[in-house]
Amino acid sequence: DEVMLDGLYGTAPRQLIDMSMYERVEVVKGASAFINGMSPGGSGIGGGINLIPKRATDDPITSVTTFYEMNSQTGGHVDFGRRFGKDNQFGIRANLKYADGETAIDDEDRNSQIGSLSFDYRGDDTRITVDAGHNEKNIDHGRTSVNLLGTLTNIPDAPDASHNYNADGTWADLEDSFVQGRVEHDVNDYLMAYAAAGTRHMEESGIYSTPRITGTDGTMTYGGSTIIREDTTNSALTGARVKFETGVVKHELNAGVSYLQNKSHQAWAFSPSASAFTGNIYGPTPTGYPALAAPSGNLSDPGL
């Protein structure tokens, strides 16, 4: 929620971001709200993160890649880009990626399906971009982070990097789709007007585990939860930038207005403390799952 997509909040994929559809990541230091508006969660203090989608370059791009990663993750990636028209004014860039199998973490399986399409126009004084993407990830027995009991006197050493200490039976399905556009127009050599708008729809479901280290020997307790979530976000930004000089001092001012609407439907259930079971961060993967109780919302349809 705190990551921008080409300067627009609310349209970047939630939770897991696959870099195969992006050209670069920009770390914006300083008061970025003056340029891109305030982050939705209000936590982007002192800077921001901006994802720039892949777009067609002056040189044609045709790339087909296959890969194999430990332990048995295999897949392929197709990247295609062309420019055409007078002075290469128009550009199109497409990316497709598929990956499936066990990751380098023991017994963690991931399936990824990624697709993106970008169109851009660059005229003498006007620039237009349209970006669309779909990001789907299915994770089975994913390794999560751990919490520490506040009264621990020492923090246990980290286990082997490939060891999966998470409870068996956990899974997560995440699906994101977005489309957005941006227009920039140079009114003259000193003034530029811009506008951007986009929308994103996200669906997430899963059964999660929350391991907590309670002993210096690596003993842990496991709680659990199931969460169903659907988000629809609409975002827009418009403004102008002006450059001028006073003597030897050069100035650049930005004035803009941003809008963001997020509709979120959620339902969940958590395991009571009495149903938590124990394990060890160094030991074998725990089997079973704590019983869930006290559901909130409709787990079959969180919109109800």
Question: Predicted regions: what is each one?
Answer:
Residues 1-35:
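Periplasmic plug
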Residues 20-23, 32-115, 121-127, 177:
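Outer-membrane beta-barrel translocator/receptor signature
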Residues 59-79, 248, 257-304:
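Outer-membrane beta-barrel transmembrane domain signature of Gram-negative proteins
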Residues 64-68, 94-100, 130-136, 195-199, ...:
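Transmembrane beta-barrel strands of outer-membrane/channel proteins
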Residues 88-90, 125-130, 190-193, 248:
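Repeated loop/turn-to-beta-strand initiation elements of outer-membrane beta-barrel proteins
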Residues 99-103, 116-186, 199-231, 275-303:
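Acidic/polar loop-and-plug regions of large Gram-negative outer-membrane beta-barrel proteins
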